[in-house]
């Protein structure tokens, strides 16, 4: 078709469809008058998207936490899910909220896909209908399963789909209901969520980076050198036990974010900016896209078993190192695969075609955090 009649409120976004004339309509009577020639309606001017705005949040503003920033750079470069564990005030939320500032800009296809989902929920800006910035969604821990994964008598997308092509941030992870967390497992694995009703089913995309943050215990100070934590080991285990093994298996990287000491807080040396980190992330993503071209996969975190075998071969030293970690950490097969994917990303950031022992060692480090152990 060449002409599209749409509600005036949706006319600007409709012009994103190429080679279609969009007529904005406010009522049926107005449409009838237009079709009869009595009162023609002018076509909606085509909306041209501007360049994405500069990120408001920047890693330059975060003091210290060099290791955490490195881990988030690796996560961004490969699209890996990550869990940050640390005491209150250590910067977990600050670090997480700045992650979109180092992610690659969305392609037009990605922007259109995100825009479609946000349009369903009425979240678009009428003056700027194309979503050009990767979403960052941070639902409260009281959210329901339907609110998180989607639902309703007329199926609507949940937060996991509203975060599609962006970041879903779950702060205070153990405070989420267990069944709510478990409901995310399949959408995380499949990159899509299907909502079934008697009248049929609807599938929404859920291609996200999952970023989670939590305290190491209920009071928040377990393992801190200050000795402020008075939680029993049983209480710590119960707190950590709120996160199931299968859920942890879907998180590629687990890192500690310790409290800053006085010297770090007083440090005035400028931190690296998000723009500088983003350049390295984009270079690594370009390598992955070239390697995986034509496969339907665009980043290391989404590699399938056959691609793992093809692109994540290890030398003898690297294989020996990984076997030692596998035995000592009692890793699952899924955890083993995730270490390989993270190691592949670290090698890409390093500009290396081969995964070396140092890449494996760093990837193991991101998997070796023992929940509930000092």
Label the model's feature ranges:
Residues 1-83, 90, 196, 335-336, ...:
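Peripheral, non-AAA+ core regions of ATP-driven protein-machinery
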Residues 4, 168, 252-255:
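Short, well-ordered beta-strand core segments
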Residues 43-44, 84, 107, 121-126, ...:
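Active-site phosphate-binding and catalytic loops of NTP-dependent enzymes
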Residues 73, 129-130, 134-135, 146-168, ...:
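Conserved alpha-helical scaffold flanking the Walker A/P-loop in AAA+ ATPase domains
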Residues 84-125:
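Walker A/P-loop
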Residues 110-144, 151-152, 258, 298-306, ...:
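Conserved inter-motif catalytic segment of the P-loop NTP-binding fold
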Residues 154-155, 178-374:
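Basic, amphipathic alpha-helical bundle interface domains used for macromolecular binding and assembly
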Residues 165, 171-172, 183:
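Walker B catalytic acidic pair
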């Amino acid at each position: 078709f060449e002409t599209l009649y749409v509600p005036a409120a949706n006319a600007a976004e409709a012009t994103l469809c190429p080679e279609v004339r969009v007529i904005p309509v406010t009522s049926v009577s107005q449409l009838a008058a237009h079709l009869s020639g009595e009162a023609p309606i002018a076509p909606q001017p085509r909306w041209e998207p501007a360049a994405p705005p500069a990120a408001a949040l920047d890693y330059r503003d975060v003091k210290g936490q060099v290791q955490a920033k490195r881990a988030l750079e690796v996560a961004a470069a490969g699209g890996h899910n990550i869990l940050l564990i640390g005491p209150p005030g250590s910067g977990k939320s600050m670090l997480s909220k700045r992650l979109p500032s180092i992610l690659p800009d969305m392609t037009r296809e990605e922007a259109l896909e995100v825009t479609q989902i946000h349009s369903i929920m009425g979240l678009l800006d009428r003056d700027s209908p194309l979503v050009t910035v990767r979403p960052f969604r941070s639902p409260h821990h009281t959210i329901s399963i339907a609110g998180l994964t989607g639902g309703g008598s007329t199926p609507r997308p949940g937060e996991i789909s509203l975060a599609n092509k962006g970041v879903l941030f779950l702060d205070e992870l153990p405070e989420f209901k267990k069944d709510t967390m478990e409901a995310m497992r399949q959408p995380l694995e499949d990159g899509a969520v299907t909502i079934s009703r008697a009248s049929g089913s609807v599938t929404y995309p859920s291609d996200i980076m999952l970023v989670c943050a939590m305290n190491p215990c209920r009071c928040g100070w377990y393992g801190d050198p200050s000795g402020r934590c008075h939680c029993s080991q049983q209480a710590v285990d119960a707190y950590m036990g709120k996160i199931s093994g299968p859920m942890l298996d879907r998180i590629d990287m687990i890192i500690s974010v310790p409290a800053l000491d006085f010297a770090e807080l007083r440090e005035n040396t400028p931190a690296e900016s998000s723009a500088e980190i983003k350049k390295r992330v984009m270079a690594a993503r370009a390598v992955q896209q070239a390697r995986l071209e034509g496969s339907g996969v665009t980043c290391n975190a989404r590699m399938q078993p056959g691609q793992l075998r093809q692109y994540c071969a290890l030398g003898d030293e690297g294989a020996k190192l990984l076997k030692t970690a596998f035995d000592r950490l009692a890793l699952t097969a899924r955890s083993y695969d995730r270490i390989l994917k993270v190691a592949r990303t670290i090698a890409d950031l390093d500009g290396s075609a081969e995964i070396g022992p140092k890449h494996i060692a760093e990837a193991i480090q991101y998997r070796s955090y023992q929940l509930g152990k000092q």
